[in-house]
């Protein structure tokens, strides 16, 4: 897998500075700059780190490409929480790291679900259920008997998660019955996907990915480039393909049956002028 790393040095002075050396989609860092700054402030404040009597020099690096849809913001928040924990010997367990990262994610999402920071904190294949009340979210680590070969396509477009979420919320308020029906189908789809993952049934997983993408189109989360990349993936052998993350840009993932197909999808997408890479899930 790919990672974001963070390093914190303590020097004389007060406040903090940041040096962001992460590889990124062109324009991503510029568009997300205000959110990055606020997320750092959120994490520092949550962990009650003193910046009145000392100055923090924060740096981010790693091989995870910062792009919409890959969980880059969560990786940044989680890596910062871990670096602060190490630098100041805060003795935080993963649950506390996750809580700090969630506070950072609020700068990007307004009201984040918590899934991205949870995936970033714990890693692996995760079953996540958000608690819509005041209780805790549910998180289980799953084991699939089969590795999932994924081709990731980058649209090169950076969308604002906050704006997309606000648009969808407005549409839901305008047409609650339509959205309740879609969300009901969504719940069934996710339960079916969990069963298929536990069996390693990639044919079913691929079919469910395709259905999921159609739902995302219905709620206006997908964009033209997302749809184009989904079609390219399917035309070149993907069992299933869908956007991932914010949508209206960002990334598309395609599920391949074997490494040769995975390679083919990536190569064709690159020939079309987009960046693409390979990963494995499970």
Give each language-model segment a name.
Residues 66-68:
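Helix-loop-helix module between adjacent transmembrane segments
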Residues 79-82:
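Alpha-helical metal-binding/catalytic segments enriched in His/Glu/Asp
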Residues 94-95:
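A sequence/structural signal of beta-propeller blade repeats
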Residues 247-249:
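Glycine-rich nucleotide-binding loop
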């Amino acid at each position: 897998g790919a990672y974001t790393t963070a390093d914190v040095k303590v020097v004389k002075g007060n406040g903090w500075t940041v040096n962001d050396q992460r590889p990124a989609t062109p324009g991503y860092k510029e568009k997300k700059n205000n959110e990055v700054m606020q997320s750092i402030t959120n994490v520092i404040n949550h962990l009650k780190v003193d910046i009145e009597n000392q100055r923090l020099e924060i740096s981010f690096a790693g091989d995870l490409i910062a792009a919409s849809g890959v969980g880059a913001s969560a990786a940044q928040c989680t890596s910062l929480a871990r670096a602060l924990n190490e630098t100041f010997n805060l003795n935080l367990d993963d649950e506390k790291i996750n809580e700090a990262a969630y506070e950072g994610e609020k700068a990007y999402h307004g009201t984040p679900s918590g899934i991205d920071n949870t995936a970033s904190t714990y890693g692996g294949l995760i079953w996540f259920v958000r608690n819509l009340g005041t209780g805790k979210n549910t998180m289980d680590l799953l084991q699939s008997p089969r590795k999932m070969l994924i081709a990731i396509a980058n649209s090169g477009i950076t969308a604002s998660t906050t704006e997309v979420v606000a648009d969808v919320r407005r549409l839901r308020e305008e047409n609650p019955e339509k959205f309740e029906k879609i969300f009901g189908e969504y719940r069934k789809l996710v339960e079916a996907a969990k069963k298929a993952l536990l069996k390693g049934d990639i044919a079913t997983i691929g079919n469910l990915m395709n259905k999921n993408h159609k739902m995302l189109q219905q709620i206006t989360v997908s964009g033209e480039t997302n749809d184009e990349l989904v079609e390219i993936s399917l035309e070149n052998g993907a069992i299933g393909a869908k956007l991932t993350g914010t949508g209206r840009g960002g990334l598309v993932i395609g599920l391949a049956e074997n490494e040769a197909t995975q390679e083919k999808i990536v190569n064709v997408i690159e020939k079309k002028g987009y960046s693409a890479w390979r990963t494995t899930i499970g």
